Amino acid sequence: MSNLPFTVAALYCFAPLPQYESLREPLAQLCCANGIKGTLLLAAEGINGTVAGSAGAIEKLIAHITAIPGLGEPELKYSHASEMPFHRMKVRLKREIVTMGVEGIDPLKSVGTYIAPKDWNALIADENTVVVDTRNDYEYAIGTFEGAIDPQTRTFREFPEWVKQNRDRLEGKKIAMFCTGGIRCEKATAFVKGLGFDDVYHLKGGILKYLEEVPREQSMWNGECFVFDERVAVGHGLAESDVELCRACRRPLTPQDKLSQFFEEGVSCAGCYAERTPEDRARYAERQKQVKLAEKRGANKHIGS
């Protein structure tokens, strides 16, 4: 049991939800009434999201979601935060609950073999296994598993094309995939199996479940795991990390990254300095000035974030 005041729940479930639009308002009302913040995505293929609130509030929400007809038990990962990691509550209607952009991908029909965290090390240590990080390049940059391939994608939509262009690296191998919480791998493994590969595996519960269950001394994870909230990243035991966001480009920054000559809080980092014009940086600098003034007044921290 954590002493931190906020419970963070990352959840998803693939299930046919033909009337998903009607679920939006009841979910939004329940979350607002119980002080829950975060994002929930609803689509005809299921539900996905990460939310935070008191333990009791999150328990109510999960009970509500589990009771939705046809949905069943969602895949759930819990962690904790010292401060509310979200600024508002959003319940959105989408075409996909995780956007791959490939028609006909259905994890309910075909998906890779799930590997429990306790068995993951043995799989990725096998010399006949190719380990693929299905996340984006900025996530890979701050942490990944030993020997994992970085597809260097900026969005998950780019992943299918990477697979097609790198078939030769996967042929004749066991293909082990992983992502933050497991949902991207549901579609990634379904896509790869659809191309004719048979030995396709993915980490059940994702990196978050691995970091929760596998002791640091046995871990093959290096670095931090990026999360899409104000904690920015978590480490072993799902402890909060010292990684921060560049408020200009939203890239994660380690303490070492902040030593770069191109880093200026709220204005630029080494990753985005060359991508921005002097006018952009001047605008960001003014915004950062307003953020600091607002903080002094005790206003909301998320101005400009």
Swiss-Prot record:
GO terms of biological process kind: tRNA modification
This enzyme's EC code(s): 1.14.-.-
Leading EC class: oxidoreductase
Domain of life: Bacteria
Pfam family, one: Rhodanese
Function: Catalyzes oxygen-dependent 5-hydroxyuridine (ho5U) modification at position 34 in tRNAs.
Family assignment from sequence similarity: Belongs to the TrhO family.
Official protein name in the record: tRNA uridine(34) hydroxylase
